[in-house]
């Protein structure tokens, strides 16, 4: 049985994915929801998340990074309650101390605070190959992800946006 892990960002498109996946969960599939908390979201985003959890009665696991002091040592996973979500820059401050400020040459924010952490959590909880991850992407995301030049080439050669999104998901796995 595959566990479907939906990485909820706190945005509208991501909420729509939660809505769609709730239909699959109601049909008997094993669907779980996670939120990767950076401590740097807008307060209204946190309110939206809390309201969605309450109104839709979903079980949302909120994960944030606990930064290990040692370079080379894996950062650890901290689970916090939905009611504890707030703009406190907790993980961000830890990253700055350990790695310094991110830059174009070293853009580690999303990879360290979201992607690696989500992957490590899922492997720890469900084992390698025991889960499938889902993310909601806005229609304008392929252009940002691929870059304007590559996006135009793909689009002008007939690749629909939904295929680009699927390709992006395959690349991330």
Question: In which residue ranges do the predicted regions lie?
Answer:
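Nucleotide-activated chemistry modules centered on ATP-dependent adenylation/adenylyltransferase
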Residues: 1-173
